[in-house]
Amino acid sequence: NVYTAIPLSTESGVRTVNTIRYNRFNTTFTGGVGLKADYDEVFDYALGAPTVNKGNLNQTLIIMVPNSTDYGGICQMWEDGSAIAFCPQSTYDYPLDTRGVIQHEAGGHGFGKLGDEYIYHNAFIDACDCSCCGHVLEFNGAKSLGWYDNLELTGKMHSVGWSHLIFDDRYSDIVDIYEGGYMHNRGVFR
């Protein structure tokens, strides 16, 4: 089931560290492409949808479209399966447009529980000491929840989660293993 809701705010826009906006869920940019909100208030609001209840809220993907065209999106995911995908409007061309942001954040992360495949750092994941993204501990935590089936910390063909596709004649000329993912160009395979 898909439901659309348009909660009203006192003001239009998204808060920043320098700007106060009185919006419905206290949606705030946290730097870079980060977004946060009053998550409890968001979940309480979602409980107003006809078939959503406390027993299935953690199986309900919530997509928020903040009233902003500042590019970026993020999907907050909780261990119980709950997810809120923040997908601001975008004026860029596909795949960076609004549709692409929704596909990536809501479809890829919130629904599919897939990990990011792009690269920020020219470093091995287990040697990187940056503070801007997750590393092996966070990666393994997500894997223990059954997430990130598109990523592995091994490049062994028979050990990756998609090995059945690599060795299937219908896909063997398309599916392979590539190094780089989860923001690191080494030590993560997609």
Can you name each region flagged by the protein language model?
Residues 1-121:
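Active-site-proximal segment of zinc-dependent metalloprotease catalytic domains
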